[in-house]
Amino acid sequence: MNVETSCYALNKPFGVLSHFTDEGGHPGLGSLSLDLPKDVYPVGRLDRDSEGLILLSNDSSFIHELLEPSNGHSRTYMVQVEGDVNSGQIEALKSPMDLRIKKQVHRTKSCEAKLLPTPVVEDRIPPIRERKSIPTNW
């Protein structure tokens, strides 16, 4: 039996979970009224308070190829932080670090990090936080 595979690109909005069901009073992708087949699933995830590209597919081989860490697919994130950022902080971010999650320690891999010029981004609801007395960096 041949099943037609499909892949969709979605700009996941801020405040929406990366799975289709609502949870804890927060809307999931299913609340977006997308006209998608029932057999597609997110390829990875973005946190609820993140926005950006998320792929959806029904091709399990494709999903596995992208998510399997040993395949070495990189990801790029633009992050806004409060306060001035210095080179020492950037270097620390590039290095592996230990994260404690549910009483277990997980070691991150090293990564690339750099300061970016402030991007032009679309308005969103809620607005991106800007405070006059606290600088931000990307």
Question: Which residue ranges define each predicted feature?
Answer:
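RNA pseudouridine synthases
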Residues: 1-138
